[in-house]
Amino acid sequence: MSTYNIVVVGAGVTGLTTALLLSKTPANKVTVIAKHMPGDYDIEYASPWAGASYMPFGKKGSDHAEWERATWPALRDLAEHQPESGIHFQDITIHNRLKDQNTATGQWSAELTSANPWFKDFVLNFQNLPRDQLPPGIDNAQRFTSVCINTAIYLPWLVSQCMKNGCVFKRAVLKHISEAAETHHSGKKANVVVNCTGLASRTLGGVADDQVYPVRGQIMIVRNDPGSMTSISGSDDGGDEVSYIFPRAAGGGTVIGGTYQKNNWDPLPDPNFANRIMQRALKLDPRLVKEGQGVEGLDIVRHGVGLRPARTDGPRIEKDQVDGVKVVHNYGHGGFGYQVSFSCAEKAVGLVNEIIQQQHDRAKL
């Protein structure tokens, strides 16, 4: 049987999911190379800092929306049948303020906070809250059952699933994407390289995509558990500040955030932002602390900053050839990498298969 050597560059949620789907075909021999691996916490490595939850942002009818629709069944299946993945069901309440519609956070969440969103027919238990149940200043709100992902469990779980299928993991730092073709664990040149380097695609040789930019998110993880997830379209603290609360599975703590700061590379948690994040979280869901405690009642595990790998024209999922190396790109997913991970990986795998089929056909001539 013919075998095909594939190198996936990047070990965030996009790279790991792509490697997992590729490795399900026995003929594919997959090597994953990355500067950062699950267990690392680094400003360049966005996936560990994610909330992470399923909250669709894509505009109705867009590729983004279809990717989110197509990924939901996989996340739902993991929550139902493989709780060891660190994914569990959580109710979420989304609050919308019309005055946020022209802010960075309001535009980011416009579809999510719509009173009639496209995803209402397939997420679980969707309902619009009656107007008499809305908090002051809220124009509409919705509630549904989503999933929350404990990234500290899920990313290593993806690694373990890849390894069960024979994937080999190697740390490496590349200056040029074409170098990846020489890093396959077989010692032979790769048939295809899959570029899942996220924000690094901005500077990686042979890619150097100037459409890629960071969107800074500052969060904190606390031990407090309010019992369900909550989010809102914006805040009065600034157009790029927002509030969300995500209790993670398996003792992962509760993520509270956050910020949506485009082109901000600052890797250090800002104490002023941290204070505002805590104040907003308590206002959004007072159940976080006992009555009368205030922010002093928040038991902080850690502060963190992640740079969402956004791209001006949206994710790049396409075939390429760089210095004679066949490349498939899958990067630029911004703050929605988890909730499009499976569908975008499936598209990337389809492109890899096209390249392999072409190589196979030429070899027969």
Where are these regions (language model features)?
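Helical element adjacent to the flavin cofactor pocket in flavoenzyme catalytic cores
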Residues: 138-192, 196, 201-203, 351
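C-terminal catalytic lobe of FAD-dependent flavoproteins
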Residues: 130-132, 157, 291-365
